[in-house]
C-alpha cells in the first residue's frame, strides 16, 4: 500500500446537490496519495448513496456513518480514522484548484510546516463569478516571506485568518 500523504476529511449532512462535484474535484487532484474520509452526520437525503457509488469507482474513499452531532464531531471522528501525514478538512460544497493538495503538500514538506493556509474565493450568485474574500486570509497582514512564525507577526498572528477549518492544511503526526 502506498504511503498516504494527505487525509481529506469531509463532514457530510444533506449535501446531495454538491457531493458529485466535490468528490470529482478531490479524486481529480494531482496528488494521488490521498484518502478521502466522508463522515455522514445523519443525512436524510441520498448523500450516503452517492458516496457509496463513488466508493465503487475509487478505493481511496471511505464512508463513516454517525448520528447527527454536527460538523465538529464529524471532523473529529474523521480525524480519528485518518492515516495521512497531513490532514485537510473540506466541506462538501468546497471546490479547489486541481493541484491544491500537491502545492500545499510540497510547500509543507519543503518548509517543514505544521500548517499551511490558503486563500479562498467565494461565488457571488448575483454576479455569477468567483470573487476574492479577505475574510478567510488577510493577505495585507502577511509578511513578505511565504513561511513565517509567530515571532514574525506577533501583534496579529491570530488575526491573519478566521477559524474556518477548510482553508488550512495541518501536519498530523
Predicted segment positions?
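Nucleotide-sugar donor-binding/catalytic module of glycosyltransferases
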Residues: 1-173
Amino acid at each position: 500500500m502506498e504511503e498516504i500523504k494527505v487525509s481529506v476529511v469531509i463532514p457530510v449532512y444533506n449535501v446531495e446537490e454538491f457531493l458529485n462535484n466535490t468528490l470529482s474535484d478531490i479524486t481529480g487532484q494531482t496528488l494521488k496519495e490521498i484518502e478521502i474520509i466522508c463522515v455522514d452526520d445523519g443525512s436524510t437525503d441520498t448523500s450516503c448513496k452517492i458516496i457509496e457509488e463513488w466508493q465503487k469507482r475509487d478505493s481511496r474513499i471511505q464512508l463513516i456513518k454517525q448520528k447527527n452531532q454536527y460538523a465538529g464531531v464529524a471532523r473529529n471522528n474523521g480525524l480519528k480514522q485518518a492515516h495521512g501525514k497531513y490532514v485537510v478538512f473540506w466541506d462538501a460544497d468546497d471546490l479547489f484548484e486541481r493541484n491544491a493538495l500537491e502545492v500545499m503538500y510540497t510547500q509543507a514538506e519543503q518548509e517543514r510546516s505544521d500548517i499551511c493556509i490558503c486563500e479562498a474565493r467565494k461565488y457571488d450568485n448575483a454576479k455569477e463569478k468567483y470573487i476574492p474574500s479577505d475574510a478567510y486570509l488577510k493577505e495585507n497582514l502577511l509578511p513578505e516571506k511565504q513561511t513565517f512564525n509567530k515571532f514574525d507577526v506577533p501583534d496579529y498572528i491570530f488575526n491573519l485568518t478566521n477559524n474556518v477549518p477548510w482553508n488550512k492544511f495541518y501536519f498530523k503526526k
